[in-house]
Amino acid sequence: MESDSGTVMVRVMEIKDGSTKTKEIIMEMPVRDGFLKWEGSGCLLAAVFERYGKGQAVGYGLVTGDCHKRGAVATSYAHDCHNILVAGANPADMKLALNRVIEMQGGMVAADGGRIQAELPLPVGGILSDRPAKEVGAGLARVREAMTGLGYRHYNPIMSFCTLTLPASPALKLTDKGLIDVKACKIVPLKVEGQRTQP
C-alpha cells in the first residue's frame, strides 16, 4: 500500500454456501508501515501465482464468508487457467501449503499449525492424477474433510475454492493479473480508489 498508516477501503471476495459465485464487499482495513494489516480482520489473504513461465505474475486478494477460518489451502487445480491458488489465515501456513503443491508438481493441500493436514497429488499437468480412481477419491475426501475442519462451510468446499480464480463467474474473482470485476470485464485494484480514512 502506498499509505504508510491509517486505513484504506479494500475489495473483498465473499463466499456464500450454495454457490460458486462470490459477492464483492468493501471493507475498511488498517495500514501500518505501508503494509495492509489483514490478519485478524476476518479475511483470508489469497494469492494466485502464474506457473507457466510467462512472467511469474502474482495476483493478490482477500476472501471472507463461508471459507476456512484457520490455516491455509493451496491448489494447482484452479479454473480456468490452473495457476496456483493459495489462501490462508497466516503467512506460515500459506507458505507451507504452497511449497507442498510445488513439491508434488501439482495438487491440493490443506495446512494448519505448521503441519500438512491433507494432500492430493495431481502431477499430470497439475490437474490430473496418475493413481487409481479409488485412491484419488480417498485423497480428495481427506482434503475436503480437512477444509471443513478448518472452518469451510460450503456444500462443496473444493469446487468453491477452485473457482475463486474463474473470471467467467460473478462477481469478483482473482487471477495472476489481479482482481477481476466479472460484470465490468476488467481488472480492478485491491484498494478502492478515492476511499481512504485519515490516520
Pin down the residues of each PLM region.
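Weak global preference for isoleucine
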Residues: 8, 12-15, 25-26, 84, ...
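Charge-biased, low-complexity intrinsically disordered regions
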Residues: 174, 179-199
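Hard-cation-handling environments
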Residues: 1-44, 165-176
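Feature captures the catalytic cores and cofactor-binding loops of soluble hydro-lyases/lyases
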Residues: 34, 39-172, 193-198
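Short, solvent-exposed coil/turn linker segments
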Residues: 1, 132, 180-181
